[in-house]
Amino acid sequence: ADVPGNYPLNTNGNMYYCTILGENEFCRKVCKVHGVKYGYCFNSHCWCEYLEAKDVSVWNAAKNYCKNPVGK
């Protein structure tokens, strides 16, 4: 079964590059920043399972999930 998801984008609007394919601690952390629990390295970029389009940009994800009230 294919799990939906997206490639998250960093502050420059680029995908997160990764070198260790599959299980990847860096990608898991990236995906948590974007508001989802799990992700891995696929085709040299981090992929996040269940990442919705509204949270693909790290700026949007930060606004949606950051607890810091600055800028709200």
UniProtKB/Swiss-Prot annotation:
Keyword match Disulfide bond: yes
The protein's location, in the record's own words, is: Secreted
Q: Which residues form the LCN-type CS-alpha/beta domain?
A: 3-67
What tissue expression does the UniProt record report for this protein?
Expressed by the venom gland.
Gene Ontology annotations for the cellular component aspect, listed alphabetically: extracellular region
Instruction: Detail the disulphide connectivity of this chain as listed in its UniProt entry.
Output: 18-41, 27-46, 31-48
Q: What is known of its domains?
A: Has the structural arrangement of an alpha-helix connected to antiparallel beta-sheets by disulfide bonds (CS-alpha/beta).
The family database entries (Pfam families) matched by this protein are listed as: Toxin_3
| Similarity comment text for this entry | Belongs to the long (3 C-C) scorpion toxin superfamily. Sodium channel inhibitor family. Beta subfamily.
Would the keyword Secreted be found if you checked this record's keyword annotation? Answer: yes
Protein known as: Toxin Acra II-2
Keywords of the record, alphabetical order, are: Disulfide bond, Ion channel impairing toxin, Neurotoxin, Secreted, Toxin, Voltage-gated sodium channel impairing toxin
Say which species the protein is native to: Androctonus crassicauda
**Chain's role:** Binds to sodium channels (Nav) and affects the channel activation process.
Q: Which InterPro entries match?
A: LCN-type_CS_alpha_beta_dom, Scorpion_toxin-like_sf, Scorpion_toxinL/defensin
Single GO term (MF)? toxin activity
| Coarse class of the protein's main subcellular location | secreted
